[in-house]
């Protein structure tokens, strides 16, 4: 299979990855990716970036060593209403916003109904472009 892009990646800034943005760009270029998205975890995830990090993304080049880049975040869906952990004033300037449910950040009932409601409500946010790993078995989803 030939992949042309990867939009769900993390650097050392997220606290659990090992490469810098520049190293990720170089690796993506070596692999022949046409587009690389860097989407660090938003602040509710323990050990990750402060909101100032995301405000500063606007100064990072969108082409690094010839590799086209999108810079954004992996937001944490916090509740059944689909609220996320960065403000609209920050996420509206990002190239890509993934919204995901993670165990340390979603402290709501994890029933299929509540998780599905959380994802559907998050989809109403005009700045969210991708739903991250909805197949996580810890958070059952009604696909019907």
What are these regions (language model features)?
Residues 2, 42, 47-144:
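Extended substrate/RNA-proximal surfaces in nucleic-acid metabolism proteins
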Residues 22-36, 56-60:
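Alpha-helical scaffold segments that flank or form the walls of functional sites
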Residues 34-35, 39, 129:
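Short acidic/polar active-site loop segments enriched in Thr and Asp
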Residues 7, 39, 132:
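Single, functionally critical "micro-switch" positions that shape active/binding sites
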Residues 16-20, 112:
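Glycine-rich anion/phosphate-binding loops
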